[in-house]
């Protein structure tokens, strides 16, 4: 009997232990998941999509095979760099760099270049931990030799000891303080930037804070100009066209696990850096973030007449044969903050609800985003707080939700008034907001003076079966963010009708002297008989719009209006992926017909 009691007691204890272990494990799992989710988010904030050449991040944030079992299948190389050492990192190699204490370094990047290292001076470094070996995944080490006679196309990392030692004595705190009074400090934990002085940064000695000069993050570019005569390009790169990044930290920081699209040479001026490297063939096990935002690859893409608010068709082609117009937007963006803005807008409004416009003036781009909504009577739209730019996105979204009805872009309008609210984004300017009202020209209208305030609220009457595009010609009035209602200054009509009635339209706009060059220019783009055109008149410019161009006509427009040549070449190479789209363009001219700026439009 006593034995039976003992067995029962022991069994109960075992059951209790099992239950406790289950709940403890569940709690730890949930905690780990929450921690990993936060960590993933942190790395995502630093991650750069394929439109940047650097900083493509992994979701892995700890060198822990318990948290990330796939690390067991990778080959890891670990070593230290000290003052004067250099590390050649070929494109595509994953690297994770920790800085210990005060550390100053310079990174050089280049594309399609080579470095000069004598083959017989390379020694193989064995990895500290070994998983599944990749072909040719080796790291070599050599002492620096000033010999440029041997040329090798090297695809493996190389540690070059004592190859950049001449600057350590020069780059003292005093030297930097005299050169660089003000800096922008990157917080690697919160992914924020603080404007401060170099003296405060040095005195604070905060962990995870550092100074960088990466172009794609648009910070500290002044430092590169200040130090351009002090930073020495190593002799092994003396013939390579490269760019550089100055990197300064005063306490512990780590880069996170990432790779770059360019070959790089990390040169340590002062301090210690601990390095982990993984070969490109380990990428399947390293949990990389996607190279394209979700909104840039929406499938199937829709072919839509964006600014005429008419859905033409949903594409049914295989996904590998077509791309949406949002990819045309993505390829113009090289600013992380703007990518974040578009991500937020997409998360709020979803696909096929946001129209974008990209405007080019002397090579400088401005991005505009338009929201098509309906309202019974135009209402007051609150002004954004220009003194608090960090808060404008959520505030603008709230305004839209409170004041406007959301209308799906792929459905006909079934309300009386169409409002188009928009805001601009420029890296150097705060966005502004405007609202456009669309309404038709009365049949007997001969002069703008005949319009009165009541006419402005007689927007086109539509039904679920009737789309705005069947009500040509359309006349547009502007209701701006200062709530001043302006009379109409834009006409939309079929191209053939615009040319036929050009005298009447230009008389309405009071610019009959522009007839010759406007008539010739309208015929320059758009061979399709269903092409729609628009004339928009402002104080000192005339805007001409074409709706429904082919991709080849769109490329012609980009080439002739000084859009970025790299962008045009990319589109020309991949033009078949966009042949299903009907493109919309605009060119603004002065009254003599000289082009001033251009733009194109699409949908997210």
From Swiss-Prot:
Pfam families, per database record: Cupin_8
Annotated localization: Membrane
UniProt topology in membrane: Single-pass membrane protein
Keyword check for Membrane: yes
Keywords, sorted A to Z: Membrane, Transmembrane, Transmembrane helix
SUPFAM superfamilies with a match to the protein in the record: Clavaminate synthase-like
Domain (JmjC): residue spans on this chain: 1-127
Transmembrane segments: 4-24
Cellular component terms (Gene Ontology): membrane
Family matches, as PROSITE patterns: JMJC
PANTHER family (alphabetical): HYPOXIA-INDUCIBLE FACTOR 1 ALPHA INHIBITOR-RELATED, HYPOXIA-INDUCIBLE FACTOR 1-ALPHA INHIBITOR
Protein name: Putative JmjC domain-containing protein L887
